[in-house]
C-alpha cells in the first residue's frame, strides 16, 4: 500500500531551499565558492582522477567509511550501487566471498555456506596489490575502489564480474600521529554488548623513513540460542542421560546462548623508505586471527518421514552441536619497490599470503535423515551427533612487474607481467563421537543345541 507525506515533503523542500539560499548568500559575502575535492584512484595502476577512468567505478574515502560506520566488505553494499552480498553472519563471511556485482558470482550463496570455498570467485578482491579474499576490517583504509564489469586485463582471473580494491594508508614521512578509537554496540536478542578498539601510530624515522603500525580487537556477540546441545566430556565422548544404560541412552542435553558470537584480532606493520622522488620501497606485514562460533541461522523443525514442519522459537537452533567454531589465521607479507625511469614508472610488487582455517561442522541432521529411514543405520547407534573436522590452507606467492607511462603524455600505456603460485588444501574427515566405544560394549548371548544320534552296527 503506497503512502504519501505531502507535509513532510513540503517541509523538506522548504528547508532545502532555505539552505541553498543561505549558502548562496554566504558565498556572495565572502567571495568564496564551494570547491569539490578531487577523487584520485588507482584503477588503471596509476594515480588519476576518477573522472578520467573509462570504467564504471565507485570510490569510497576513509572519511566516508568512518561516517557510515562501515566495518567490513559486507557493509560496503550499503554505499556501493550494484554491489550485493548475502550477509550470512561472521561464521560464513570470514571465509567466503559472497560479493556479487551485476548479478555475477561463482555459485549460489548456499553452496558457500558450510566451509571454505577454494574456487576462484567471479568478483576479485585486492588488499593493496595482493589478490586475496578475506572479510578484511575496514580500518586504517585510505580508500575503497569498486570496479564494475570485467577487469581481467589488469586484475587477472576472478575479475569477470568486477574488482574490489582496498587501498591501505601508507606511512607518512612528515607526520607523527596517534589515533585511538573504540565503540560499543548492541544486537537485538543478544545477551551482551559488542565492542571494538583500535590504535594507529605513525612515526617518522628521519627524513626518508617512516613506520606505521595499527592493531585492534573486536568482539561481536551472537543472538542465536542452541536449545538442544549435546554434552561431551573432556575427552570428547558423549555424556549419557542415563549412565546406567550405555546401550540405548541418549545424550545429556543443555542450552547454550549466543552460539554465533565472534571475535577478531589483527595487527599491521608498514615501513616506507623514500630517499628521493625517484625511488620508494614499502615493506608491509599483516597478521589477523578470527574466531567464530555457530551459524547465524534459524532452523526449522522438519519431520523427514511426513515432511511436516513445526514452529519453534525465533532466534534458536536445535542442532546437537550448535557451537561449530571456525578459527582462521592470516599472514600477509608484501614488498613494493617503485623507481622513476624518466619516461615511466617501473614497479615491482612481491607478496605472499598464508590463509589457514580449522572448523567444525555439525552433520547430525544428515545422520538423523538416514537413521529415521533406517533404524539400523550405524547399527542402531542411539547417540547420533556427527560432525566434520575441517582443515584448509590457502597459500600464494605473487610477483608482478609493471611499467606505467607518466600522466599527461600524448600516449598512455601500461605493460607488465604477473605470476602467481597458489596452493590450496581442504580436508574434512567425519567423526561420530562414542560410536567406537559403543560398538565394542560387552554383550551376552544364549546358544542352545539339541542333538541325538543312533547307530546300528553289524
Regions found by a protein language model. Name each.
Residues 328-357, 386-458:
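Face-selective signature of the C-terminal outer-membrane beta-barrel domain
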Residues 189-293, 331, 393-399, 404-420:
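Transmembrane beta-barrel wall of Gram-negative outer-membrane proteins
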Residues 143, 162, 168-188, 211-215:
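Transmembrane beta-strand segments of Gram-negative outer membrane beta-barrel proteins
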Residues 105, 182-188, 217-221, 287-291, ...:
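Transmembrane beta-strands of outer-membrane beta-barrel pores
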Residues 34-173:
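Acidic, small-polar-rich N-terminal luminal/periplasmic segments of exported/outer-membrane proteins
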Residues 38, 98, 126, 143, ...:
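Membrane-embedded beta-strand positions in outer-membrane beta-barrel channels/transporters
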Residues 223-258, 293-321, 362-389, 429-458:
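Solvent-exposed loop segments that connect transmembrane elements
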Residues 1-31:
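Cleavable N-terminal targeting peptides that direct proteins into the secretory/outer-membrane pathway or into
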Amino acid at each position: 500500500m503506497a503512502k504519501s507525506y505531502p507535509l513532510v515533503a513540503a517541509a523538506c523542500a522548504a528547508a532545502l531551499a532555505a539552505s541553498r539560499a543561505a549558502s548562496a548568500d554566504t558565498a556572495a559575502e565572502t567571495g568564496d565558492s564551494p570547491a569539490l575535492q578531487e577523487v584520485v584512484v588507482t584503477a588503471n595502476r596509476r594515480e588519476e582522477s576518477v573522472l578520467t577512468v573509462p570504467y564504471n567505478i565507485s570510490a569510497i574515502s576513509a572519511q566516508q567509511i568512518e561516517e557510515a560506520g562501515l566495518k567490513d566488505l559486507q557493509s560496503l553494499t550499503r554505499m556501493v550501487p550494484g554491489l550485493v552480498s548475502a550477509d550470512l553472519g561472521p561464521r560464513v563471511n570470514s571465509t567466503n566471498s559472497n560479493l556479487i556485482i551485476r548479478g555475477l558470482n561463482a555459485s549460489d550463496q548456499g553452496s558457500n555456506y558450510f566451509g571454505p570455498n577454494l574456487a576462484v570467485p567471479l568478483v576479485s578482491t585486492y588488499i593493496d596489490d595482493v589478490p586475496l579474499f578475506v572479510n578484511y576490517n575496514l580500518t586504517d583504509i585510505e580508500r575503497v575502489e569498486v570496479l564494475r564489469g570485467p577487469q581481467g586485463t589488469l586484475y587477472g582471473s576472478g575479475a569477470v564480474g568486477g574488482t574490489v580494491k582496498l587501498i591501505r594508508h601508507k606511512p607518512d614521512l612528515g607526520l607523527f600521529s596517534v589515533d585511538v578509537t573504540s565503540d560499543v554496540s548492541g544486537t537485538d536478542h543478544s545477551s551482551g554488548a559488542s565492542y571494538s578498539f583500535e590504535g594507529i601510530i605513525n612515526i617518522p624515522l628521519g627524513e626518508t623513513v617512516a613506520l606505521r603500525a595499527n592493531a585492534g580487537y573486536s568482539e561481536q556477540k551472537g543472538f542465536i540460542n542452541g536449545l538442544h546441545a549435546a554434552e561431551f566430556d573432556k575427552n570428547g565422548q558423549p555424556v549419557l542421560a542415563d549412565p546406567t544404560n550405555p546401550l540405548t541412552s541418549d545424550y545429556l542435553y543443555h542450552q547454550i546462548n549466543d552460539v554465533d558470537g565472534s571475535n577478531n584480532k589483527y595487527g599491521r606493520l608498514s615501513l616506507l623508505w623514500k630517499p628521493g622522488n625517484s625511488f620508494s620501497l614499502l615493506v608491509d606485514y599483516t597478521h589477523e586471527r578470527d574466531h567464530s562460533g555457530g551459524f547465524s541461522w534459524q532452523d526449522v523443525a522438519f519431520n523427514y518421514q511426513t515432511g511436516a514442519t513445526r514452529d519453534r522459537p525465533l532466534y534458536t537452533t536445535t542442532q546437537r552441536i550448535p557451537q561449530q567454531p571456525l578459527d582462521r589465521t592470516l599472514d600477509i607479507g608484501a614488498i613494493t619497490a617503485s623507481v622513476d625511469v624518466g619516461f615511466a614508472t617501473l614497479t615491482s610488487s612481491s607478496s605472499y599470503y598464508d590463509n589457514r582455517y580449522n572448523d567444525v561442522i555439525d552433520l547430525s541432521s544428515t545422520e538423523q535423515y538416514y537413521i529415521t529411514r533406517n533404524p539400523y543405520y550405524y547399527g542402531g547407534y542411539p547417540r547420533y551427533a556427527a560432525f566434520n573436522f575441517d582443515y584448509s590452507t590457502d597459500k600464494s606467492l605473487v610477483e608482478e612487474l609493471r611499467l606505467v607511462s607518466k600522466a599527461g603524455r600524448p600516449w598512455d600505456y601500461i605493460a607488465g607481467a604477473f605470476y602467481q603460485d597458489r596452493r590450496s588444501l581442504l580436508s574434512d574427515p567425519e567423526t561420530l563421537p562414542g560410536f567406537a566405544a559403543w560398538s565394542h560394549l560387552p554383550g551376552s548371548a544364549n546358544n542352545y543345541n539339541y542333538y541325538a544320534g543312533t547307530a546300528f552296527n553289524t
